[in-house]
């Protein structure tokens, strides 16, 4: 399966296809969660939001085809929900990026956190949704220039965050722009 059809048609945009190539070195992938993975994750998130205000779940897992020999064995796209804004302390391994409410990238993962208020309730207190793209290979130390990997993980997290914001019908797509902002925040 080609990268643009992973997890849900439209969830992996053109930039994220290139990011997957940087991360995995693969052009073909094992079939994943189907055509409605993002819609299913948004439905699960919506079900959690009302009663509890926090939770976690998986959007999908991405597996390079067995004949691929890339550095990452599996990439998981997960969501986390919180009713409070993110804390300002970001783990040292993450480079802060200016996307939506909070974002960060490392050589093996990235996240984008965005507020989501339904369009039909603009005065409602927004929930915070974090979308993570993470390598599930054994942890390794970063070597050499890790900027391409950081940018790739950030691009992948942004692609899925934007797809989730659209699926959740967040006001103004939760402030997420069509392209990721990869210049570190100051």
Where do the protein language model's features map onto the residues?
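A small/polar (G/S/T-enriched), proline-flanked helix-loop surface module common
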Residues: 1-156, 162, 173-185
